[in-house]
Amino acid sequence: LEFRRVLFRSNIFGTLANHPDLLRRWLVFASHVLSKNTIAPRERELLILRTGWNCGSRYEWGQHVVIARAVGLTDAEIERVTKGPSNKWGARDRALLVAADELHHDRRIGDETWRMLEEHLSTEQILDLIATVGNYNLVAMFLNSTRVELDAGVPDDPRLG
């Protein structure tokens, strides 16, 4: 897909190139999360967007708005991610967003949310959900700390930082 070619020309990779060993090792895990994940791409992007929003990461949010559109999320759904889980989402999407929020705020998925997830996802998918949110929390910390600049053409949201 075009977004993958664009992603690898992104400012984040230029910054990470300052530490080639870190970049090489992180890419193995990040590649699983982004392209070998057992979660559907649309759902993966819901998780990443919510994580980016929760972490106040303009770069992560903007990059993944582009990717989210490419995998079928509408602009209305993307905006709704900023509001978090609500009854406007279907049960599966709401469970994903609740899990992302719990992982961000509590650093764990609560028992009730785990049961909700089990209604929609396999154990493998739940583990990939945790890995996705965890990876993008790390990425947001990196992006926010090193102040990686937005790439050209990536949407900015002034509500973030």
Predicted features and spans:
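Short amphipathic alpha-helical segments and their helix-coil junctions
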Residues: 23-37, 111-119
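Acidic/histidine-rich alpha-helical segments that form the ligand environment
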Residues: 83, 92-130
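Short alpha-helical scaffolding segments that buttress acidic/His motifs in well-ordered protein cores
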Residues: 13-16, 26, 30-33, 46-52, ...
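Residue-level detector of well-ordered alpha-helical segments, enriched
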Residues: 25, 42-45, 60-63, 77, ...
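Acidic, carboxylate-rich catalytic segments that either coordinate divalent cations
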Residues: 116-118, 142-161
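Short, small-residue-biased leader/transition segments that mark boundaries at the very start
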Residues: 1-7
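Conserved alpha-helical segments that form or flank metal/cofactor-binding pockets of metalloenzymes
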Residues: 39, 45, 51-71, 75
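Short acidic alpha-helix initiation/capping motifs at coil-to-helix transition points
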Residues: 21-25, 56-61, 94-95, 103-111, ...
